[in-house]
Amino acid sequence: MLKSIQKRKNKLRAQRKARVKGKIFGTAELPRLTVYKSNKHFYAQAIDDNAGATLASADGRKLGLGANREDVKKVAAEMAKNLASANIETVVFDRNGYLYHGVVASFADALREAGIKF
């Protein structure tokens, strides 16, 4: 039963991701900031889709953090620092099919508080 629930959740997330994928595009001047969350960790990266390159990233696993709201705020602070070192002030936020709720919303709010615009 639990596996079928998880399969349905993953299928719905994939549908949301596919629906949005054609509308969001990142460049070197305005990169796409995408997030990924697992049950244990939270990851984020700024991507230039023209070059297919990652411009900045933050990894909660490397920082020894979990995937709760308080730890995600620390990942957002690290991401803001990495974006500032790459001279990036504005990004296009790609929630990667996740609902804008919980840790994804906390991450976005913490990035805005750190001065990143989107």
Curated annotation (Swiss-Prot):
Keywords: Ribonucleoprotein, Ribosomal protein, RNA-binding, rRNA-binding
Entry-linked InterPro entries: Ribosomal_uL18_bac-type, Ribosomal_uL18_bac/euk
Keyword flag Ribosomal protein: yes
GO molecular function, one term: structural constituent of ribosome
SUPFAM superfamilies: Translational machinery components
Gene Ontology annotations for the cellular component aspect, listed alphabetically: cytosolic large ribosomal subunit
Keyword Zinc appears in the UniProt entry: no
CDD domains the UniProt entry points to: Ribosomal_L18_L5e
Cross-referenced Gene3D superfamilies: 3.30.420.100
Gene Ontology terms describing biological process: translation
UniProt family annotation: Belongs to the universal ribosomal protein uL18 family.
Function: This is one of the proteins that bind and probably mediate the attachment of the 5S RNA into the large ribosomal subunit, where it forms part of the central protuberance.
Binding partners and assembly: Part of the 50S ribosomal subunit; part of the 5S rRNA/L5/L18/L25 subcomplex. Contacts the 5S and 23S rRNAs.
Full protein name: Large ribosomal subunit protein uL18
Source lineage: Bacteria, Pseudomonadati, Campylobacterota, Epsilonproteobacteria, Campylobacterales
